[in-house]
Amino acid sequence: MPFSFIHYIISFSKKDNFLKKDAFHAGMRRKRLLGAGAAACLIPALVLGGCGTGRAQGEDERFRQYTREVFCQEISSDLVSLHYTLKEPEKYGISGAPAVFGEFTVDSAQIKAACENMETALTAFSYDDLNIQNRITYDILEYYLEAAEESADYLLYDEPLGLVSGVQTQLPVILSEYQFYDRGDVEDYLKLMQSTPDYIDSLIQFERQKSEAGLFMADYAADTVIEQCSAFLEMGDGNYLYSTFSDRIAGLDELTEEEKSDYIEDNALMMEDCVYPAYQTLLAAVEELKATGQNEKGLCYLPEGKAYYEMVVRQSTGTEQTVRELEDLARRQIVEDLEAMESIVGITRGEAQETAASMGKSDAELILSELREGISAAFPEYPDTALEVKYVPEAMEEHLSPAFYMIPAIDNTQENVIYINQAQMGDDLTLFTTLAHEGFPGHLYQTVFYEGTDPDPVRNLFSFGGYVEGWATYAEMCSYYLTPLSKEQATLLQKNASIILALYALADMGIHYEGWSRMDAVAFFSNYGITDADTVERIYELIIGSPGNYLKYYIGYVQFLELKKEWVREEKEEFSQKKFHEAVLTVGPAPFDIVEEYMWEITADSGADE
């Protein structure tokens, strides 16, 4: 599949206030394997797959040698992937990478060939002789190769200019968070900025091919992309890529003041000569291609669109359940949540919302501190880490998410950043649960805990949105019970949030699989008391522009609930939330079938020899 920088995006709505809530993991890694850099996989696959290294090394050692080679080949294919994955690449024997963002490809034959080579390489290892951690990695590699082969038939169906997760909104964030550890990083960054026009040209060429195939985006989606590009350009000299560069370079003691001043001038030159012109070119291209799209409705109206959506659902949720089975799962969870709400007497949801709106919790740092302490009873310990809270620039508040977490390099998890969009926080409860989603026990906690288990680095190449976003949503739901609200108030509001999330997931499947029209969506939401036409219109268009986006965090969330129910049935009176959480977190991001298979033995075996 074509790729740019790597991200996870989710969208979330709070009852009457439609919000786009991203868990933007700007890790610039995961989901890289077998993308445009697929050729890089051929070398380790061919060399190590058939080489006679000998069983004397031990199967685990041979396998880890192989996965290390795959990891190093992949992350060194472009500078962004390398820098966002490793702070000290030299410790992995990597001297550098091309100063590019990546590229877009429609070469399905190349991807399939790389898959076949890696599948052949895997057969050279004795699965039964691998320890549990390596068996998990093997299973994930096998799963991912099958998924990549399947995706290769639908390359032009992908949309890199997504309304929530598009290149046009995320590239500036990637640049603004590019860390400067030394002078070389500054030089590399400037080269990267210089490469922006080539990267955007590659993107435009991809969009032209989509247009020729009748797969270009709907007109209203193109209008949104145009607005987002325009907003970035209109920032002019006030663009945060000027100020963030100055802030980062100020901390480099090895540079003289004169050198810092020169670099600041170089950055301004790159903005004027490369970045802004690239955005102007992109804006013009989208304006030109607008109206060439042939479908303004769900994916099922495209040729093979229904089959493509089924694939999207499998890969975004990490489940093998059919769309119809997931629809039933969502409806059953709605009934369960409604029954929990109906069992509460003496308080209304409206009263609970009024209390929650003024909890007196408005300081992000204090909330995060409280969350750290509050989760200690039910969640396992995690490595010490630092956290910086930053705020979305005012000029971009309309176009960026309420909050997002930046994934740190895997060898630098001590440094973490969460961005807050103050314009979209709404009330105290929104801020509290959002910080739980992004921080503790959500994305930040899950990332730091997992990296603390010393996993195989190759697993950082893969994206399992159902697990990652599902966990963060599960964490968000848990956080309602850590607020100052009474248990009854928390239950009402948490179950209500869960139901709303379910409705958006059902709408996603209804629009893209069942073929709902706009009026069908209006009728569906009106049945649940959501009658504001503008809100439903925005929901419909966002779902059109981001197929499967809601599913990865709602279905992922429900999958964690299902795993917990299974754990309770097995453990009975011995059930421990902390042990359950430790088990699923130690398995780490993976399809849910793999999580379920290994969660029972992983904690006991996590110290096995590698």
Report residues per predicted region.
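C-terminal motif of bacterial Sec signal peptides marking the signal peptidase cleavage site
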Residues: V47-G50
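N-terminal maturation segment of proteins
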Residues: G52-E610
